[in-house]
């Protein structure tokens, strides 16, 4: 149980899509059913095909959800930030995991077991609806990613990722938008399903053209319009 740290995690969870509309009594009821799990950077949380018996929320740190092709190529499906959940499909259907989850930083997770939480969801239709909305959002995101792989070359796919990172993590500065998230070039390559070397070359092209810059370890988006032109008008980024 996580009741001793309940106050500590309320604000984090209330910032997430699933929990933000909850009444405090509902959130406390969820916390009373949950357990905490500590994971180290690089630790595998679960793998595709593992028995699915829980949904998890990130309290601190960050988690990568992804899969591997038969050739061993990694594809990142989502990056889960504090307050957001993952593994929700297994919570609903109890079937094996459909993807891998790995901590990209030292992280604290809230584990919501299917046996404990599913009856609570069944008794609270509004909360069940919000879980289904999370599932729908992930399906839309996967659909966009698959469409990108089929229709866009590397510059288009990478432009979409950089624009989404700028929207999710960006902070306006005097020069442009600073993207405040720690992602290696290997992480970026996994997001666009290509090699790190190819990503490096494309980033170098954009830096030379003044589209992107670097400030320490952070990427600076200098020319958003140039990337939007590669993505296309009205293109969904999520």
Task: Specify the residue positions occupied by each region the protein language model found.
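Phosphate-/nucleic-acid-contacting segments
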Residues: 154, 165-238
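Cyclic nucleotide-binding regulatory module and flanking cytosolic helices
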Residues: 1-41, 90-91
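Residues that scaffold the ATP/ADP-binding catalytic core of kinase and kinase-like folds
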Residues: 66, 88-89, 119-120, 161, ...
